[in-house]
């Protein structure tokens, strides 16, 4: 039996995000016909949509940069927070498909499985080695501490003459 995924733009794991150019001759959507941009691979909107779907807020406080991501239904073991090249914060997650019993009869499938991946280039005034992440009630919070602003080194010069 084939399970049909629902389409919801607010679901971070949905593979069916709205494409405003879908249906136009120059559209990037998988259903567009006769694209005038043959170098764009057709059908990529649904394959990449799961990676673009995770909604993440980023705010800056005097002490830190704080990232908040809604990851409902994920366990902390299914979420990864990494730093690449010392200044790129990468937040990813994957919800696996549940084991399907062959004897079960499905009436509706609204919970989806899939992956998401988001990257953020951190400003220079951060301390990536002190990043902390926590998850509570389906919300991932990543805190990136900021460095203390350097005070200028002032040297007095004696005036002669």
Swiss-Prot record:
Signal peptide limits: none
Pfam families: HSP20 (PF00011)
Gene Ontology cellular-component annotations: cytoplasm
Segments traversing the membrane: none
Localisation: Cytoplasm
Induction: By heat shock, arsenic, azetidine-2-carboxylate, cadmium, copper, ethanol and hydrogen peroxide.
Keyword list, A-Z: Cytoplasm, Stress response
Annotated ranges, domain sHSP: 47-161
Matching InterPro entries: A-crystallin/Hsp20_dom, CS_dom, HSP20-like_chaperone, Small_HSP
GO terms under biological process: protein complex oligomerization; protein folding; response to arsenic-containing substance; response to cadmium ion; response to copper ion; response to ethanol; response to heat; response to hydrogen peroxide
Alphabetized CDD domains for the sequence: ACD_ScHsp26_like
GO MF terms, alphabetically ordered: unfolded protein binding
Family (UniProt): Belongs to the small heat shock protein (HSP20) family.
Subunit (UniProt): May form oligomeric structures.
Protein name, per record: 18.1 kDa class I heat shock protein
Gene encoding the protein: HSP18.1
């Amino acid at each position: 039996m084939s399970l049909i995924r629902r389409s919801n733009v607010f679901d971070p794991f949905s593979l069916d995000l709205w494409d405003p150019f879908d249906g136009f001759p120059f559209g990037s959507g998988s259903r567009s016909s006769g694209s005038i941009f043959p170098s764009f691979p057709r059908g990529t909107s649904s394959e990449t949509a799961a990676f673009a779907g995770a909604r993440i807020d980023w705010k800056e406080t005097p002490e830190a940069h704080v990232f908040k991501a809604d990851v409902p239904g994920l366990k902390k073991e299914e979420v990864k927070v990494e730093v690449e090249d010392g200044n790129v914060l990468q937040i990813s997650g994957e919800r696996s498909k549940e084991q399907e019993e062959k004897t079960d009869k499905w009436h509706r499938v609204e919970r989806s499985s899939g992956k998401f991946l988001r990257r953020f280039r951190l400003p220079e005034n951060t301390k990536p080695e002190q990043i902390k992440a926590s998850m509570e009630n389906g919300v991932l919070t990543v805190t990136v501490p900021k460095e203390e602003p350097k005070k200028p080194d002032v040297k007095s010069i004696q005036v002669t003459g």
